[in-house]
């Protein structure tokens, strides 16, 4: 297993820098290392299901931990923003969020049958004119031209069928997932297109009014969030 010293872990990891000298790194996958946590760290340090890697490998090999409804058996599997972790044996479900300091944290959910929120990062035209939607968690699904980049989708799990389409537009509710306003939620009041190499910006009104770059904004609902926010934070 590939490891790194705990003092060098990415800032987005909420795992403390004390205790174990070495932590496992994430394997290349649906999320970058900077924006994900290894499944092994989650089940050992956060959920405290196991005491060591050997125990972790055993419960994963037995299919006791699901990510987005699929059993994952790799301690280094990357778990990122809005991913859903389910523990069927104890009927517990968690969603990965990002706090105001940009750190990833698990929120415990009351329901076990939950949906997944994803942002459309890109669109690809396939042979025959079919449109493929490339989502922020690495998922690729077939769609149509009614969907635009930066729109969000609510997907059922584990089949990832589109349940609802949320447009990236003024008036919709959004969460900021980067920069100094990370973790804040508010209504989009303006989308400012910059005709240069600089980033487009988005004005948001929440507890305060602020502006952030477009890439940091993910639509989470229209009048209300389409995914449950809050809940017990597991640290």
From Swiss-Prot:
Highest taxon listed in the record's lineage: Archaea
Cited Pfam families: Ribosomal_S4e (PF00900), RS4NT (PF08071)
Keywords, ordered alphabetically: Ribonucleoprotein, Ribosomal protein, RNA-binding, rRNA-binding
InterPro entries linked to this entry: KOW, Rib_uL2_dom2, Ribosomal_eS4, Ribosomal_eS4_central_region, Ribosomal_eS4_central_sf, Ribosomal_eS4_KOW, Ribosomal_eS4_N, S4_RNA-bd_sf
GO MF annotations, alphabetized: rRNA binding; structural constituent of ribosome
GO cellular component terms, semicolon-separated: cytosolic small ribosomal subunit
GO biological process, one term: translation
Signal sequence region: none
Start and end residues of each S4 RNA-binding domain: 37-100
Similarity comment: Belongs to the eukaryotic ribosomal protein eS4 family.
Protein name: Small ribosomal subunit protein eS4
Name of the gene: rps4e
